[in-house]
């Protein structure tokens, strides 16, 4: 009925919330097709991050009525500006650790996991790591941190490593690996992929940008050197 009137804009307020999973997937594909066909600007309100990522050309992430970040879905996923945004987007959710930076080295517990050339004041911080942002490191040399294996789950092409670490803000965290990997040890060393982890201020939870993992150009922000 709304489309018959040929409006300049459509507002859809959680239209799929009462549908079952299969129908919801089909309907969001149809909504996307109709929007592209008609060219009508559409505001789609949802609490489902998968809907937001799959349907939208641009995402606005809100918290308590305040805008946290706006941008293309992949830009927001790849470079969250706030810890809330990082935790909202992604399934499985991003892993968050209590950490610190000292003399440019980033620590989880007592182990250095990365070193940045960006001048950042020594401070406690949150280190958020995407599940796909870690690899099992065989060598004991170099950066990385050790974790205790809780479960190994093979799901088709992916292997989910469920592990524990005292610095993690939850009881366990997940690491997504290729299913052709064989994990038999009870404790492993994990190394970080440079573009799959993010640093956040411990008080404000705002992103601390480093040159090894800067803000995308589309955000219109320059690399932040946090000298206090």
Question: What would you call each of these model-derived segments?
Answer:
Residues 26, 79, 87-88, 137, ...:
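Residues that scaffold the ATP/ADP-binding catalytic core of kinase and kinase-like folds
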Residues 39-42, 84, 93, 171, ...:
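Secondary-structure boundary/capping signal
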Residues 78-101, 128:
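C-terminal boundary and immediately downstream tail of ABC-type ATPase nucleotide-binding domains
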Residues 105-228:
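Non-catalytic connector elements of ABC transporters
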Residues 20-22, 50, 67, 73-74, ...:
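Generic secondary-structure boundary/loop-capping signal
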Residues 1-84:
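ABC ATPase nucleotide-binding domains
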């Amino acid at each position: 009925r709304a489309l018959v009137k040929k409006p300049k804009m459509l507002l859809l307020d959680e239209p799929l919330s009462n549908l079952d999973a299969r129908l919801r997937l089909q309907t969001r594909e149809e909504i996307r097709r109709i929007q592209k066909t008609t060219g009508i600007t559409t505001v789609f309100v949802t609490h489902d991050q998968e809907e937001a990522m799959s349907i939208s050309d641009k995402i606005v992430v809100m918290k308590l009525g305040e805008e946290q970040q706006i941008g293309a879905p992949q830009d927001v996923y790849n470079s969250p500006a706030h810890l809330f945004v990082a935790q909202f987007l992604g399934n499985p959710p991003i892993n968050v650790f209590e950490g610190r930076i000292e003399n440019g080295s980033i620590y989880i517990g007592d182990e250095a996991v990365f070193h940045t050339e960006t001048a950042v004041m020594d401070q406690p911080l949150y280190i958020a790591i995407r599940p796909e942002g870690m690899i099992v490191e065989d060598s004991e040399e170099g950066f990385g941190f050790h974790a205790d294996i809780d479960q190994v789950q093979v799901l088709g092409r992916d292997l989910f490593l469920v592990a524990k670490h005292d610095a993690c803000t939850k009881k366990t965290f997940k690491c997504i690996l290729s299913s052709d990997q064989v994990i038999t040890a009870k404790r492993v060393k994990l190394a970080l992929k440079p573009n799959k982890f993010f640093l956040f201020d411990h008080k404000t939870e705002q992103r601390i940008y480093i040159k090894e993992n800067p803000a995308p150009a589309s955000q219109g922000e320059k690399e932040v050197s946090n000298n206090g």
